[in-house]
Amino acid sequence: TCALPILLHDVSVIAFFRPDHGYWGAQMLEPYVDEEVSWAIRMHQALRFFPDKSVGYEYPEVYAKRFGDDYQVEPYVQRDYEIARNHKWYMSARMICLNDLYTFDPDVKVDIEDFEDIIGRHFKQPEEGLGNDSSPAAHMWRTLRRPANAL
């Protein structure tokens, strides 16, 4: 379960939402993955702003450059951090943060084909196809597929 949220957590950033991408990504994926996976994706949004020296997670330098050293998170982010840090799936969300830093390193090359088996075994693809099912997230996948659709 741990690898899947790491692989999928930025789906909404790639798609269309940068702000609150963890919340959007979790909602997009929730109907198709185990609850722990969507929870981890949602909560990494908050955890990424808070160091955890016990697992070797420091506040990312790229965040300090982007947001500034004195950046204060929004109250909802602080609240979700407090919820997540004592949750049984804390490390699933924290592992996203620990492994996310590789995406900021231009020297790290990752080939998605290496992970197709993991995704295929754990992602519950609807028979009708993403966006064609009746899940609460179907409209997001339709928008992703056709962002310029007039109606």
Question: What is each residue range found by the language model?
Answer:
Residues 1-4:
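Short, small-residue-biased leader/transition segments that mark boundaries at the very start
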Residues 10-14:
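Catalytic glutamate of the conserved HExxH
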Residues 9, 21-25, 43-44:
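Histidine-centered active-site/metal-ligand motif
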Residues 15-31:
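Post-HEXXH active-site segment of zinc metalloproteases
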Residues 17, 31-39, 43-151:
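Divalent metal-dependent phosphate-bond-processing catalytic cores, especially two-metal-ion Mg2+/Mn2+ enzymes
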